[in-house]
């Protein structure tokens, strides 16, 4: 899998920094971070990335407006999920997931699964 540009949408700064480190360690390029829905949607509209790691819970809100926009633009994303998360809406049920807590191996696996999903779609 060639190096990709990855946008990280995560509301916890330390987790976002850890994901940036993991992404770089795996040969990819962090394309930036966003920690809330409004900033994330602005980043999505600007573009400049190949893939998104998207935290399901962003503060008191869920990520579905962002996931909807990414899907409309055919931009692949991985849903980062923590403990008490409800099932995603049906239109995002097949999105690759990355369960918390993250490890380098689980991030690698999620990125590889996202690549496989893209090939299946394309």
Regions picked out by a protein language model, each given a short descriptive name:
Residues 10:
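Conserved acidic carboxylate
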Residues 13-32:
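Two-component/phosphorelay signaling modules centered on CheY-like receiver
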Residues 33-51:
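Acidic, metal-coordinating helix/loop segments flanking the phosphotransfer/catalytic sites
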Residues 55:
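Active-site residues of response regulator receiver
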Residues 59:
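The feature encodes the CheY-like receiver
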Residues 65, 72, 83-100, 109, ...:
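Alpha4 helix (beta4-alpha4-beta5 surface) of REC/receiver domains from two-component response regulators
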Residues 78-81:
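Hydrophobic/aromatic residues positioned on beta-strands within the core alpha/beta folds
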Residues 102-122:
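C-terminal output helix
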């Amino acid at each position: 899998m060639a190096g990709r540009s990855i946008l990280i949408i995560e509301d916890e700064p330390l987790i976002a920094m850890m994901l940036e480190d993991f992404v770089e360690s795996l040969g990819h390029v962090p394309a930036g971070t966003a920690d809330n829905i409004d900033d994330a949607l602005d980043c999505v509209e600007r573009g400049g990335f190949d893939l998104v790691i998207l935290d399901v819970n962003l503060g008191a809100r869920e990520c579905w407006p962002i996931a909807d926009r990414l899907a409309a633009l055919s931009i692949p994303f991985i849903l980062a999920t923590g403990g008490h998360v409800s099932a995603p809406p049906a239109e995002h049920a097949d999105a690759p997931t990355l369960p918390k807590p993250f490890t380098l191996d689980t991030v690698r696996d999620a990125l590889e699964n996202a690549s496989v999903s893209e090939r299946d779609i394309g």
